[in-house]
Amino acid sequence: MEEFQVYLELHKAHNFLYPLFFQEYIYALAHNHRLNRLNRSSLFQNGDYDNKFSSLIVKRLIFRMYQQNNFIISTKNLNQNTFFSHNKNLYYQIISVVLAVIVEIPFSIRFISSLEGKELVKSHNLQSIHSIFPFLEDKFSHLNYVLNVLIPHPIHLEILLQTLRYWIKDASSLHLLRFYLYEYSNLKNFFIPKKSTLNPRFFLFLYNSYVYQYESILFFLRKQSSHLQSNSFGILIERIYFYGKIESLLKVFIKKFQDILWLSKDPFMHYVRYRGKSILASKHGPLLISKWKYYFVNLWQCHFYVWSQSKRVHIKQLSKDYLNFLGYLSSLRLNFLVVRSQMLENSYLIDNVIKKFHTKIPMSSIIASLAKARFCNVLGHPISKSTWTDSSDSEILDRFVRIYRNLAHYYSGSSKKKNLYRIKYILRVSCVKTLARKHKSTVRAFLKRLGSDFLEEFLLEEEQVLSLMFSRVFSVSQRFYRVRIWYLDIFYINDFVNH
């Protein structure tokens, strides 16, 4: 990227992006973006460069786009438009890939400029998905209620454009972006197949920009509520926009309504987001969390013009309900302990309640995914994987082992990992049935001929790794299924369906 830094320098007063659409090096950078993990010199090689990623072709595309008679093409003339019907793949792929690179430039420059003169702390462990769970394990024991939020998608494209308008000041780029989004939204139902090969980076960038704007407003309201509440000369009246200090009401309500003072100020509130879901946890009772639910709904409806459904926001009590987040079912378990305390001749019984963070494997969803991938039926009974019978024995076994390791690796933080026995059983029997089907034999005859030890050598490798980490006081298998372990090298949830 350092080689292109000179070309990517923008004028600070204008931030013009439109001329970059006609620079050839942008297309080389866009097409070879995935090679950033390889040698940087490969960007200048022609081995992986496609001629269709060219500024000349994009010039023709943009010219033909603007030559269309209608800004939004109706359904009547869709079939008559030869440009969109014959060149739809080329149109969407090239424009989306190039837009993804160009619109990120202002954000990258702002990020780099903000880090000038500052030492950037690099911690790869914080990038792991499992790094969230130790935080929840430490914090959730002090919390009571959680607001489980499913972030809604914007219903109008102008909302996305207004979000980008804060960062991109180039009117020509915004106009081209608006034109492309409107054309895509009107044509995708007719021409874009379900299994499209479009570059999702651009649409992911739009969604992240929208979520960033939403979270910025949310955090601003949170800070404003705390700041206004900290003033001793007034009280905060609960309203949508968190404003309305009335000094004259202080003398009337200060004695009778002391509890109002902390309704909007909660130092124990925590916010976590992953993909399209977020959680807002609080230490206080249901009244405060209900108010935050009301604020969420009004924020979406008033600012983003999104009609929020009630099923998108759920209030859960951690001691009673399970929280479905990041593939785990999390909750707080209440352990009641009775302690006898004796002072001189008097003895007392003290009841103590200890909250413990509990994580559970969602077996119903895992079995549903395994059934969808044809490893078992809907009841969890293993079946053969018929589509893999053309592969070699070692390749079939390696696929099943890799699926089990991914699941065991991710769900190693569960409080009770007995359900992993069931997952292992499904995959092992499915593997044996697949191999037996390939060799046109029965399961019993196949196991009798080869023996069952060849499966144990692969599927128990996770336990063999743990044997080097812990002492052999107990058996490794028992320790593996009793100890909760959070790994800090998991950057995404593995999709075992495609393995």
Swiss-Prot record:
Keyword DNA-binding: no
UniProt cross-references to InterPro entries, sorted A to Z: Domain_X, Maturase_MatK, Maturase_MatK_N
Main localization category: plastid
Keyword Chloroplast annotated: yes
GO molecular function, one term: RNA binding
Pfam short name (any one): Intron_maturas2
Keywords of this entry: Chloroplast, mRNA processing, Plastid, RNA-binding, tRNA processing
Localization, UniProt: Plastid, Chloroplast
A Gene Ontology BP annotation from the UniProt entry: RNA splicing
One GO CC annotation: chloroplast
Superkingdom of origin organism: Eukaryota
Protein family per UniProt: Belongs to the intron maturase 2 family. MatK subfamily.
UniProt xrefs under PANTHER family: MATURASE K
HAMAP family linked: MatK
Function: Usually encoded in the trnK tRNA gene intron. Probably assists in splicing its own and other chloroplast group II introns.
Stated name of the protein: Maturase K
Organism of provenance: Batis maritima
UniProt lineage: Eukaryota, Viridiplantae, Streptophyta, Embryophyta, Tracheophyta
Gene: matK
